[in-house]
Structures are given as structure tokens and as C-alpha cells.
Amino acid sequence: MKRNFPKLIALSLILSLSVTPIANAESNSNIKAKDKKHVQVNVEDKSIPTEVRNLAQKDYLSYVTSLDKIYNKEKASYTLGEPFKIYKFNKKSDGNYYFPVLNTEGNIDYIVTISPKVTKYSSSSSKYTINVSPFLSKVLNQYKDQQITILTNSKGYYVVTQNHKAKLVLKTPRLEDKKLKKTESIPTGNNVTQLKQKASVTMPTSQFKSNNYTYNEQYVNKLENFKIRETQGNNGWCAGYTMSALLNATYNTNKYHAEAVMRFLHPNLQGQRFQFTGLTPREMIYFGQTQGRSPQLLNRMTTYNEVDNLTKNNKGIAVLGSRVESRNGMHAGHAMAVVGNAKLDNGQEVIIIWNPWDNGFMTQDAKNNVIPVSNGDHYQWYSSIYGY
């Protein structure tokens, strides 16, 4: 499937973190670690709308707990660090607000992304949407006591050190330059390195909260054997990755691989024609049928109850999305897999989704048909294929 390259965006960071864990984090509601250094993210300004801040503080633990249960992680305690923003090279924000979720060791486990609603396409009535995933958490944790900048373009995410060399740290599936170098020079005078304020993203902003009660009480439903076995590279095979993951889960096997699926369906294509080919819904249904399944096309997003019932019955669901930002180019259409669903302790219903580009899962409001993805784009969930 085809996609246009988005513009380069940038996030400036200065990181330094002590090796000593935060002391007495459970009991101290006003944590001020003056003797500790923290990850500092450069921002143009630290202003966050009150509605956004309240939404993050109110709901983050429920979202995080749903992912913890999906990952079969133990009960834990979390808090939020200071929120930060991501900028384009013209110093304009990408419009989102990012809240790091800290564990008691002072490391970032998840990123809460709050976005203004994409009004034209979204079925949600809320002004903002919230999504939680690992996103850049591992990257932020890898550069302790170093001054860095994070940049992103169509090739992925880069860490820029003080010598202005950019290292690719998070590759996206949009790579098309076979001669891509792992380091690139960044102009020293670039204005994104001159943002004046700093957000202490690893400084706890409130008392740590245990998710013990939420973990025990919160309803989470998952395809029992769903695992991330491979991720999408420089190709158009999102549907192949999606179907492979779903069939591996529902058959409890490791035999399905995206490339083999694509070769089965397009045996005569070679070279770049094969590399960048995609699949139609009809081809996706046909492949499921050849594997002993009876997939059905639904010309809309599946409801929460439908996801709940299908997942309980070990039937996989493929998401078919259309990119909001551009309907042309590679990945203008994109397939993703439904991992399961959860009902948060505030009653909100969410669907757990795996994007083949990612090494982790993400939460999606069950009433919102626009899915934000890890490169900053949004996909309108317009159809589903269920029964894998």
C-alpha cells in the first residue's frame, strides 16, 4: 500500500538521570528530588491546557493497567512526568501533548499521547483523544546523562548528540533509500536546538499510584496467543503482517510470516513490484479461506461488544484504515490487528491494537474510529475483516 512522506519534525531533548532510584516514592505526594538530575526536554513553552492535563491525570493509570495486563506484567506503581511537545523544524508544535509514565525506578514505561480530535473524520464527540503505548519510552531511557535532540523524518526517529550527528534509533516502515546512512549531519544553527524552556520528563509530578486494585478489577480480554513475532520493514506488506499475526495467534503457531503470505498471493511479482505491493480486502479474505478460516468483510469499525465476542471466540480481526493526512502514496491504506479489548475502571471501553510498524500495542477509544499511529499520522478505521 502506498504513502507520501510526512515532513520532518523535531523534538529537542537534554537528558541526565541519576542511577539512584527515587526514594520513598510511594508515600511522598510532593516529590522534589533537588539532588537528582532528570531527563530535560526542550520546549518552546510549557503551557498545557487544563483539560488536557486533567484528562491525562485522571485516566493514565487505567490505560497503563490495561496494557500491563495484556503484556502479563506484574502489578506496579506509576506516576506522570512533566509533559512535553514535539516540534517541526519551523518550531511549530505537532499539536499533540505527550505525558511520560514513570515507574518507581525513574524510568519511562509508556507515553500518553493526547491529541485534538480530527474533527472531519472522527466519530468521537470528545474534544481530545487519548492513546497510550510504549512509543519512544525505550529511546528516552537509553540516553542518561547525555545532551541529545530527537528528530524524525520519513525514515524514522533519530537521536542527535552534541556533535550534531544523528543516529537512527527507531526505524519506521517508510524507508525507501537503500543507501541510508546510520548517521547524518544536522546543521548546528538549526532553530529547534534553541528552545528556551525545559520539561523534566523523569521528575514525578505527583504521588506514585499503585495499580493493584485496578489490575484486579479491570476487565481485559485478549487473543490468548497473540505475540509480536515480526514488524514491518521497507515494504507494503501491512496486510501480510496483520494476517500472519492473527493466524499465528488463533492457531497457536509460529508458521505464518508476512513475506510468505505476500508471495503466496502474488507469486509472479519480483523486485520492487513485489516489495511495495499491497493487498485488497478480497485478497485478504481469500487468503484466510485458504487457511481454513471464513473471514467476513464489515464496512465499518467493529464495536466494542463485537470485538469482545470475537476475541473470546478466538477469531481475529483485521483493521482496514485510510490515512487522514493524505490519500495518496505508500501506506495511504493500512492494515492493523486487533489484539483484544478492555473496560477501564471509569467505564470507558477501549480496543487494543497492534500496528505492524511497532514493537508494542496501543489503546484506542472504542467510540473513536480515527487511530493515531507512531509516525504522527492518523488512520480512519473504515472497514474490518473478522474471522481469522
UniProtKB/Swiss-Prot annotation:
Residues annotated as the enzyme's active site: C238, H334, N355
Propeptide: 26-214
UniProt subcellular location: Secreted
Protein name listed in UniProt: Staphopain A
Post-translational modification: Cleavage leads to the activation of ScpA probably by an auto-catalytic manner.
GO molecular function: cysteine-type peptidase activity
Family the UniProt entry places it in: Belongs to the peptidase C47 family.
Top-level EC class as recorded in UniProt: hydrolase
UniProt keyword terms in alphabetical order: Hydrolase, Protease, Secreted, Signal, Thiol protease, Virulence, Zymogen
Signal sequence bounds: 1-25
Pfam families: Peptidase_C47, Staphopain_pro
Assembly and binders: In the cytoplasm, prematurely activated/folded ScpA forms a stable non-covalent complex with ScpB.
PROSITE patterns: THIOL_PROTEASE_HIS
Reaction(s) the record says it catalyses: Broad endopeptidase action on proteins including elastin, but rather limited hydrolysis of small-molecule substrates. Assays are conveniently made with hemoglobin, casein or Z-Phe-Arg-NHMec as substrate
InterPro entries per the UniProt record, alphabetical: Cystatin_sf, Papain-like_cys_pep_sf, Pept_his_AS, Peptidase_C47, Staphopain_pro, Staphopain_pro_sf
Its biological purpose: Cysteine protease that plays an important role in the inhibition of host innate immune response. Cleaves host elastins found in connective tissues, pulmonary surfactant protein A in the lungs, and the chemokine receptor CXCR2 on leukocytes. Proteolytic cleavage of surfactant protein A impairs bacterial phagocytosis by neutrophils while CXCR2 degradation blocks neutrophil activation and chemotaxis. Additionally, promotes vascular leakage by activating the plasma kallikerin/kinin system, resulting in hypotension.
Gene Ontology BP term (one): proteolysis
EC number: 3.4.22.48
Main location: secreted
GO cellular component terms, semicolon-separated: extracellular region
